[in-house]
Swiss-Prot record:
Protein family per UniProt: Belongs to the glycosyl hydrolase 82 family.
Membrane-crossing residue ranges in chain numbering: none
Its biological purpose: Hydrolyzes iota-carrageenans, sulfated 1,3-alpha-1,4-beta galactans from red algal cell walls, with an inversion of anomeric configuration. Also active against hybrid iota-/nu-carrageenan, not active against kappa- or lambda-carrageenans.
EC number(s) per entry: 3.2.1.157
Molecular function per GO: iota-carrageenase activity
Keyword Secreted recorded: yes
This protein's name: Iota-carrageenase
Catalytic activity: Endohydrolysis of 1,4-beta-D-linkages between D-galactose 4-sulfate and 3,6-anhydro-D-galactose-2-sulfate in iota-carrageenans
Disulfide bond positions: C269-C298, C336-C360, C408-C476, C412-C484
Signal peptide segment: 1-23
Keyword DNA repair: no
Gene Ontology CC, one term: extracellular region
GO terms, biological process: cell wall organization; polysaccharide catabolic process
Length: 491
């Protein structure tokens, strides 16, 4: 990937520099848009219901309120023009709610929504939209200062707030999520399988949402399949706020999905990996425009990963790590398979990434019909990264401290009690404003054009950008450094 900077390009404000806004730069400015380009509110409705008064929910106990909410949704959706449901102030418990067409939910500002305990070990979502049925014209919005989704006391780590599938013309807005380091992004903009093809969301707005205490590898939103969506005013503490990482294996099998015509504005990260991430994996994605990105004590503000090809051993064959590597190289050539890693099936299924060389990737495309993913035109305007000491960092990123932090100061390793898979994540100083690990010389590269990037309070010898040409070497003892205190781990 090649990062483009107009006029000066990453001035460190700590050293007294200053940058003009992207509008002042002159040559390039963001596309304009209006809300109605993404979501159109209803002009006529048949009913207005209250969840407590009309359907008997109780916001003052610990009982499951899912049945009452589902009955209300069903009743509204049966009306030709649908209607609005008010969730009045109180504490409610929901799980597995199926949203339907023409239902518009409004939630008062003192509402607390908690997950109903299930305990079956499966993945759970509070609300599913267009997963099992087509949904058209839907909204779920907080009133006033917004409501709270509270996961803090839940023992269920397999939770998400929303999963979106085949939904069109929708708006989700105005609430806070108190997470408990669950192992999903809180809003999954996903795909769903029906009648031999995949379906995904089109025409929507997701905005005014803050997430606290997210797990490093997840965060607020992940997009798999989406067309014409506006993401606005989003903030994730921990992980990634807007993770455009299109890695759903259903999409790989169908060769369908991906994201196109995406707009984002005011995307923020604190104490996490990044505010915005591009990770195409194996999908050909379309155009993306992002404006006003900021990070405080994050690894970076913007992160871009290369697309790649990954080959899985067949489920009906038994392989070792070495035998699957040899099988791939017998098709693609020596040196074209990286070391495989286990992917289930009793420890006998393996995945091997194809080496990031055009000759190897060309053979993989010819042999398997798969090539690295990419994006279309990507422009990111007005990026501000503020240095801090509590960023989420991946193990391979620690090597970039070779010039800026060679003693690996203030980097800690979570204890096994905090995170059992030691070596996956660390907490330490911010690295750069932009991290770009895509190959510059490959024809499978994609470009991110970035305008007006600022760094605040970064040390003098820190990196401006990190890319494939950045010097790196191992300076941290990956497993011998100090343990993270509970205050650093728990935010």
């Amino acid at each position: 990937m090649r990062l483009y900077f107009r006029k000066l390009w990453l001035t460190n404000l700590f050293l007294g520099g200053a940058l003009a806004s992207s509008a002042a730069i002159g040559a390039v400015s963001p596309k304009t848009y209006k809300d109605a380009d993404f979501y159109v509110a209803p002009t006529q409705q048949d009913v207005n219901y209250d969840l407590v008064d009309d359907f008997g929910a109780n916001g003052n106990d610990t009982s499951d309120d899912s049945n009452a909410l589902q009955r209300a949704i069903n009743a509204i959706s049966r009306k030709p023009n649908g209607g609005t449901l008010l969730i009045p102030n109180g504490t409610y418990h929901f799980l597995g709610i199926q949203m339907k067409s023409n239902v518009h939910i409004r939630v008062e500002s003192d509402v607390i929504i908690k997950p109903t305990w299930n305990g079956d070990g499966k993945n759970h979502r509070l609300f599913e939209v267009g997963v099992n049925n087509i949904v058209r014209n839907f909204s779920f919005q907080g009133l006033g200062n917004g409501f709270l989704v509270d996961f803090k006391d839940s023992r269920d780590k397999n939770l998400a707030v929303f999963k979106l599938g085949d939904v069109r013309n929708y708006k989700i807005s105005n609430f806070t999520i108190d997470d408990n380091k669950t192992i999903f992004a809180s809003i999954l903009v996903d795909v769903t399988e029906r009648n031999g093809r995949l379906h995904w969301s089109r025409n929507g707005i997701i905005e005014r949402i803050k997430q606290n205490n997210a797990l490093f590898g997840y965060g607020l939103i992940q997009t798999y399949g989406a067309d014409n969506i506006l993401f606005r005013n989003l903030h994730s503490e921990g992980g990634i706020a807007l993770r455009m990482e299109t890695d759903n294996l259903l999409m790989k099998n169908y060769k369908q999905g991906g994201i196109r015509n995406i707009f984002a504005d005011n995307i923020r990260c604190s104490k996490g990996l990044a505010a915005v991430m591009f990770g195409p994996h194996f999908m050909k994605n379309g155009d993306v425009q992002v404006t006003n990105v900021s990070s405080v004590s994050c690894g970076s503000a913007v992160r871009s990963d290369s697309g790649f090809v990954e080959l899985f051993s067949p489920t009906d064959e038994v392989h070792t790590r070495q035998s699957w590597k040899q099988a791939v190289e017998s098709k693609l050539g020596r040196g074209c398979a990286q070391t495989p890693y286990a992917r289930g099936n009793g420890g006998t299924r393996w995945a091997a990434r194809v080496t990031q060389k055009d000759a190897c990737l060309d053979k993989a495309k010819l042999e398997y019909g798969i090539e690295p993913g990419s994006f279309g035109t990507v422009k990111v305007f007005d990026v501000t990264a503020r240095f801090g000491y509590n960023a989420d960092l991946k193990q391979d990123q620690l090597d970039y401290f070779s010039t800026s932090n060679p003693m690996c100061k203030r980097v800690c390793l979570p204890t096994k009690e905090q995170w059992s898979k030691q070596g996956q994540i660390y907490i330490g100083p911010s690295l750069a404003a932009v991290i770009d690990t895509t190959p510059e010389t490959s024809k499978y590269d994609y470009d991110v054009k970035t305008f007006n990037v600022k760094r605040i309070n970064f040390p003098v010898n820190s990196h401006k950008t990190i890319d494939t040409n950045t010097e790196s070497s191992r300076v941290c003892n990956y497993y011998g450094m100090s343990e993270c205190s509970s205050s650093r781990w728990e935010r």
